[in-house]
């Protein structure tokens, strides 16, 4: 499970500012 999630972490972290910007 983590072997699948770890490669996605940089993408998820990079998308956080976009989500915050969309909420604002």
Swiss-Prot record:
GO terms for molecular function: toxin activity. The keyword Aminoacyl-tRNA synthetase does not apply. Expressed by the skin glands. Keywords: Antibiotic, Antimicrobial, Cytolysis, Hemolysis, Secreted, Toxin. GO terms for cellular component: extracellular region. It is found in: Secreted. GO terms for biological process: defense response to bacterium; killing of cells of another organism. The keyword Protein biosynthesis does not apply. Belongs to the grammistin family. Group 1 subfamily. Thanks to its abundant amphiphilic alpha-helices, it may integrate into membrane phospholipids, leading to lysis of the membrane. Its hemolytic activity is inhibited by phospholipids, but not by cholesterol. Has antibacterial activity with a broad spectrum against various species of bacteria including both Gram-positive and Gram-negative groups. Also has ichthyotoxic activity. Exists as aggregates of 3-4 molecules. This is Grammistin Pp 4b.
